[in-house]
Every structure is written in structure tokens, then in C-alpha cells.
């Protein structure tokens, strides 16, 4: 991690994804049969702050040691593997989404193994790391956000600069 000032490496266990474990961060969207009516477990999207953008993003694998975490405060974001492969995501609960100086509580960061046949919707302001998968690979992901999310609604906390910390997401 060139340029980073990491003084500590903290292991973060990767947990199995369940709707209950993920509830503070967003909604797990499992496969459902076609024609099933809207239910209480369905994701409630908020795309009201702009024009929605749905696209397939190609991401190089960076491995599982990370120093940055990001959030989007104006939109819910939906992510899913386009190839049906499992992946990993780190998350921290949203806090004070109207305050751009707010940073994540590093003690609340958790990591989840996301099965390839589900999507996740992140609450507005949920801090996230990933999608992550092994270094040297490349994967495609479905992404639903706003057309300008990455330009006007992209707050990143550099864990190495702020806390001297890198997180290594490890199998529990």
C-alpha cells in the first residue's frame, strides 16, 4: 500500500451473510420466484435525489487488505455479482449522513461473505469496502445508484491516514 502510513494491521473476520446480521447496513435481496408480491423483506430503494444509474462495473481484485472505506449519503446503493460468484464486503453503520465530517466507528466495521445469487442494498450513508475478491482476478458487478453518485456523493475515510490502520478481512 504505497503512500499509506499503516502502523497496525487488524484482522476482521468475514461473517456469513444473513438478513438479521446485515440489517444495520442494508437489506439482503435473495432470489425470489417471479410474480411474488412485494413483501416486508424487500429492499426499499431511495433514488429520489437524482437520476438512477444501473450499470455493470468491472472491478479488478484487490485482495482482502484494505485501508479505505466509503459512503454515499444521498442514495441507497444496490450491488450484486454479475457472474454469480461469491464476494466479500466490509460495512459500517450510517452515522450523521448530513454531516460530511463524520467518520465511521472502526469498532463497528464488519465484513460479510456475499453469496453470488443475492444482491445487497446499502442504506443511505452506510460505509462500505468492496466488492472484494482475490487479487489478480477481475469480476463484473451490477450497480444501482445515481448517475452522479461517484462525483457528488462520494465520501471516503482513509483508515491508514486517520487511524494508522489497515484491515485484513479473513475467513472466520
Short names for language-model regions:
Residues 1-107, 111, 149-172:
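Non-catalytic, conserved peripheral segments adjacent to functional cores
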Residues 126-158:
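A short beta-strand-loop micro-motif that forms or neighbors metal/cofactor-
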Residues 85-87, 110, 118, 137-140:
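A short pocket-lining beta-strand/turn micro-motif at the edge of beta-sheets
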Residues 16-19, 121, 127, 135-136:
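Generic detection of intrinsically disordered/low-complexity segments and helix-coil linkers/edges
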Residues 113-131:
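Conserved metal-binding segment of the jelly-roll/cupin
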